[in-house]
Amino acid sequence: MKNLISELLIKLAQKEEESKELVAQVEALEIIVTAMLRNMGQPEQKRVIDQIEGALAGVKPDASVPDGDTEMLRAYVKKLLRHPRQ
């Protein structure tokens, strides 16, 4: 029983580490996108945003992905593009 608990704790720690890495990757990408958008002129920025939103609108979600997840992704992309972090 102790071995099982130990194994579960190790797996949990590994998952937590993977989760931290994913959060760091997302935050890094958010910083990069924000910096790139801020360094563009308004017309270029609008063009890039329109292209990204158009590409996202044209993507048909996989049936295995819950609708809530798809909407969350779309909302986050919109927030990132239209209201980048400060």
Swiss-Prot record:
UniProt-listed InterPro entries: SigmaS_Anti-adapt_IraP
Keywords, sorted A to Z: Coiled coil, Cytoplasm, Stress response
Keyword Cytoplasm attached: yes
Major subcellular location class: cytoplasm
Assigned protein family: Belongs to the IraP family.
Residue runs in coiled coils: 1-36
Name the UniProt record assigns to this protein: Anti-adapter protein IraP
Assembly and oligomerization: Interacts with RssB.
Species in which this protein is naturally found: Escherichia fergusonii (strain ATCC 35469 / DSM 13698 / CCUG 18766 / IAM 14443 / JCM 21226 / LMG 7866 / NBRC 102419 / NCTC 12128 / CDC 0568-73)
BP term (GO), one: cellular response to starvation
